[in-house]
Every structure is written in C-alpha cells, then in structure tokens.
Design a protein with these regions (language model features):
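C-terminal "cap" of GNAT-fold acetyltransferases
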Residues: 115-119, 138-159
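Conserved acetyl-CoA-binding loop of GNAT-fold acetyltransferases
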Residues: 126-136
Length: 159
C-alpha cells in the first residue's frame, strides 16, 4: 500500500538508510551541500516540514523543506525532492507536491532553488506550475565551478 506521511527526526534512521541506499543518485545533493550531517540538522529544526512517500513500509521518496511565516500564512522553502532511481517516472515527486496543495491550506507559496544546469529538475518544476522568479548568481559551487541558481515559486492559495 502506498502512502504519504509527515516525516521527522523519529524517521531519521530510515531517511539516512534510504539516502545511503541511493548514494550514487544522491551525490548531486551532496555536491551542493546536503550531506547526512546537514540532513540530521534539518530534522532538528522547529520549522522542518518534510514528507515521505512509502510503498508498503519502504521509503522511496522524500520532500524536505522549511516552513517560513508569512503574515497569517506560511510558505514552504523546498530544499530536497528526491525519489529513488527504481521508483522514478511513477509520478511520486508530483504526488508529494500535490499532497502539500491538497492537505495544507496554510501554505500560500512553495519556493525552490535549482542549479541552472539541472535541466531535468527545471523542466519538472515548470511542468508542475512553478514560475521562474529570479537568479541567485554563483549560488552553488561544485566540480570547481560556480553555478547560478534559478529560483521558482508556486502559488498555492490565490485568495
């Protein structure tokens, strides 16, 4: 049975095992600063908002972010959206994003920063109605070169 649920520091061992099992594919995130220590730190934050996608009891996808207070509402800054290689092309990442829209009425926007050379991710977010907002110049550094970030926003509540 497939399900989406909130994940927190109580799930940390499962999350770390999931990322280690997918270490080749997760290297991209490691290269831009998301190592296991950063993941552990993220799950200790009060404003952590993270979801897991489970097939049976196996974690196969994660959405990791921060809630940001915006007046009476909250925005979500999305840090990581990752699905195991064997489970890709099954719309799991889209289901995780849709969960936010259908189950969290307090979020007004979702923000994401994507390395400009990550064309697959850029296409994915645009397909899911994220709109380009601005560049962050030289935001990432990996493979001895600076990479700009493209920032995207998705409005959820258009009231």
């Amino acid at each position: 049975m497939n399900r989406i649920s909130l994940i927190n520091k109580e799930h940390l061992i499962s999350i770390i095992n999931f990322l280690n099992d997918n270490s080749d594919e997760f290297n991209y995130f490691k290269n831009i600063g998301w190592n296991i220590k950063n993941i552990e730190s993220q799950f200790s934050k009060d404003n952590n908002y993270s979801l897991g996608y489970f097939e049976d009891k196996n974690l196969v996808g994660v959405l990791i972010g921060d809630t940001i207070k915006n007046g009476k509402e909250y925005d979500l800054e999305l840090h990581i959206l990752f699905v195991s290689k064997d489970e890709r092309r099954k719309k799991i990442a889209t289901k995780l994003l849709n969960y936010i829209e259908t189950n969290n009425l307090n979020f007004s926007k979702i923000f994401i920063e994507v390395a400009e050379d990550n064309v697959g991710a850029i296409n994915f977010y645009q397909k899911n109605n994220f709109v380009f907002s601005n560049f962050r110049h030289n935001y990432y550094r990996y493979n001895d070169k600076n990479i700009h970030a493209k920032c995207f926003i998705k409005n959820i509540n258009n009231e």
